Design a protein with these regions (language model features):
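A short glycine-rich, Lys/Arg-flanked "PGG" loop and its adjoining helix->strand segment in the class I
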Residues: 55-67
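A short SAM/SAH-binding and catalytic strip from SAM-dependent methyltransferases
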Residues: 38-52
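Class I SAM-dependent methyltransferase SAM/SAH-binding core
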Residues: 1-28
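Conserved Class I S-adenosyl-L-methionine
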Residues: 83-104
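Conserved beta-strand signature within the Rossmann-like core of class I S-adenosyl-L-methionine
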Residues: 68-75
Length: 131
């Protein structure tokens, strides 16, 4: 599926949402100023973005988050894709982020275990916290 700006705008209109703006950009170099957003979220997207350094991608996402803003990034965070995420959580805390948690969702935290196994969600984790 190609998510055109028109498709996104039509979906927002159909849902009655008017306080959004759609922009095309590069996830590795987001076209937004530092601290532009109150919250950032992603659900199973980052593993599809090219580039080997997913932690760098996460830091770019946090760059555009306002101080005090909330983040929730859900993805297939296997060590081969993301590196040592426990060390990354510590790094975020050292940078001043609060309530940072890495929640294992590979066994169906948000769905029946049978469905999670069928979807092969090994390495699935939810990174949450506040900047």
């Amino acid at each position: 599926t190609v998510f055109t700006k028109e498709l996104c705008e039509n979906n927002a209109k159909a849902e009655g949402v008017s306080n959004v703006r759609f922009a095309e950009g590069n996830a590795v170099r987001l076209p937004f100023a530092d601290e532009s957003f109150d919250a950032v979220t992603s659900n199973y997207v980052y593993h599809n973005i090219s580039g080997r350094d997913k932690q760098k991608l996460l830091l770019e996402t946090l760059r555009v988050l306002k101080k005090g803003g909330t983040f929730a990034i859900h993805d297939l965070m296997s060590k081969s894709r993301y590196g040592d995420m426990e060390a990354f959580v510590k790094k975020l805390k050292d940078m001043g982020c609060e309530d940072v948690r890495l929640i294992d969702t590979s066994n169906g935290l948000f769905m029946e275990r049978k469905k999670a196994v069928w979807l092969d969600l090994g390495g699935s984790k939810l990174l949450v916290g506040r900047k």
